[in-house]
Amino acid sequence: MFIYDKKLQYPVKIDNPNPRLAAIIISQYGGPDGELGASLRYLSQRYSMPFDELKGLLTDIGTEELGHLEMVGTIVHQLTRNLSESQIKDSAFAPYFVDHTVGVYPTAASGFPWSAASMQVKGDPIADLAEDLGAEQKARVTYDNILRLSDDPDVNDVIKFLREREIVHFQRFGEAIQLLREKLNQKNVYYMNPAMDL
């Protein structure tokens, strides 16, 4: 099902350590709108999709989100490697450091650890695809917020790439809802569960 290519989807080369940025960007690793939740959401939702095209789309995007998880983890790692003790003490990264040193742990910028409660798999294709539209928009907004707080061009380059992919995924999920409606002969899919009521 998966083929692992031993390179990142987009290159990550951060030259300057920055614990403040790491403490913010970790949210896209394990925060409520981050890549871990996105990948698990889509790879789980695919099972209840009634059509192969939709299963394939969720598999493709879910797999891509795993690649984005790897990219965000790489950013956090590169921002925190070789930090001095004073850089850690004088930053918002210090509380994270106490629990995880410089390991990459799935948590939100707020310090709340990743939880499956931040994602949804309903088993109703319309409900799940609508959830996915919202998830992609929330991830895009989070990347926008990171760009507002970041002054590192190496970080911003990668964040802009990830932000663009959220927009593409949003568009694909919109197309998926349209495809679902067409496949159901324009039945009012908002009053039925296509996974159960076909």
Feature map (PLM): residue ranges:
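Non-heme di-metal
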Residues: 1-198
